[in-house]
């Protein structure tokens, strides 16, 4: 099994935006390899507390070892960050001074063939962040109708060939039985997309695999719920920082942040505010922060990363 290694994206930029301080309480909603978590703990020494969330038991076990030296300053929760509100209440934590969400699939999950996230190696078509619960990608591929499958691939993968891919998948499972492996699905996608339409730098199955992963793990729904929970729990002056990796995630982050920063929601035709809503956060990143060329050269995952941040008023 691959070692749970992970290069943290834009570590200096993230730390500057989160601005952890001694005595603060911070949430890392996507603990992963604990790279960002370790930096937060070091910056908030000697008594800052970190609550780390991950629904992947392998990630949680590896992270536990990597930050064990910080002792009782660490609380680990095996859960999706969308359940942050309930989990913090259980821990007796009322407010937090910051939260970080580093979205998407980790390099370890991609490199561990049996998890089924990668289209490069043959493996069971799984894609669950928590490999012990919920539907797999194979369940969706083999049970959904062509229309339902096309909708998922189109909406979550932004794939222009979604209808054709779904049609090929349904035809393949009808003729040859269930699609159970990653490369079986890759063959369907390659067959559906005309060779002339393949993009030079993107594998033809990239968007389909992204779409299924998002659907299997309810990534977009979890993101919105987690953002709301995090912002609601922030103390005045506390900060929320999010690293997204594709336009669907970034759109949700931008929308939620703007909603909390907007304040008044009255129609423009009204002469004065009657709703009474006040801005609850200040947006710290007018435009998303992007990785520099040097970082992208050493960590290609950073190429598509966008960082946005807010501060609670």
Curated annotation (Swiss-Prot):
S-adenosyl-L-methionine binds at residues 34-36, 54, 81, 102, 109. One of its GO terms (molecular function) is rRNA (cytosine-N4-)-methyltransferase activity. It catalyses: cytidine(1402) in 16S rRNA + S-adenosyl-L-methionine = N(4)-methylcytidine(1402) in 16S rRNA + S-adenosyl-L-homocysteine + H(+). Its EC number is 2.1.1.199. InterPro entries: RsmH, SAM-dep_MeTrfase_MraW_recog, SAM-dependent_MTases_sf. Belongs to the methyltransferase superfamily. RsmH family. This is Ribosomal RNA small subunit methyltransferase H. It comes from Geobacter metallireducens (strain ATCC 53774 / DSM 7210 / GS-15).
């Amino acid at each position: 099994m691959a070692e749970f290694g992970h290069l943290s994206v834009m570590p200096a930029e993230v730390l500057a935006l989160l601005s952890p301080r001694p005595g603060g309480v911070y949430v890392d909603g996507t603990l992963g390899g604990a790279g960002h978590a370790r930096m937060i703990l070091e910056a908030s020494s000697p008594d800052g507390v970190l609550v780390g969330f991950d629904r992947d038991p392998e990630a949680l076990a590896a992270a536990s070892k990597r930050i064990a030296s910080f002792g009782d300053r660490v609380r680990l929760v095996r859960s999706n960050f969308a359940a942050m509100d309930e989990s913090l209440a259980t821990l007796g934590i009322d407010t937090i001074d910051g939260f970080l969400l580093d979205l998407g699939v980790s390099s370890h999950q991609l490199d561990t063939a049996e998890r089924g996230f990668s289209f490069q190696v043959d493996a069971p078509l799984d894609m669950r962040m928590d490999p012990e619960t919920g539907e797999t990608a194979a369940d969706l591929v083999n049970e959904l109708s062509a229309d339902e499958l096309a909708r998922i691939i189109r909406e979550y993968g932004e794939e222009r060939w979604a209808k054709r891919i779904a049609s090929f998948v349904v035809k393949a499972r009808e003729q040859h039985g269930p699609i159970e492996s990653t490369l079986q699905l890759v063959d369907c996608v390659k067959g559906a997309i005309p060779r002339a339409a393949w993009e030079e730098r993107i594998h033809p199955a990239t968007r389909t695999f992204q779409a299924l992963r998002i659907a299997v793990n309810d990534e977009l729904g979890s993101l919105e719920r987690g953002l709301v929970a995090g912002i609601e729990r922030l103390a005045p002056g506390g900060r929320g920082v999010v690293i997204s990796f594709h336009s669907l995630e970034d759109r949700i982050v931008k929308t939620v942040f703007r909603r909390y920063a907007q304040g008044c929601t009255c129609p423009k035709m009204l002469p004065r505010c009657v709703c009474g809503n006040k801005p609850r956060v200040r947006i710290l990143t007018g435009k998303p922060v992007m990785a520099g060329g040097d970082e992208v050269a050493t960590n290609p995952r950073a190429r598509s990363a966008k960082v946005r941040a807010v501060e609670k008023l």
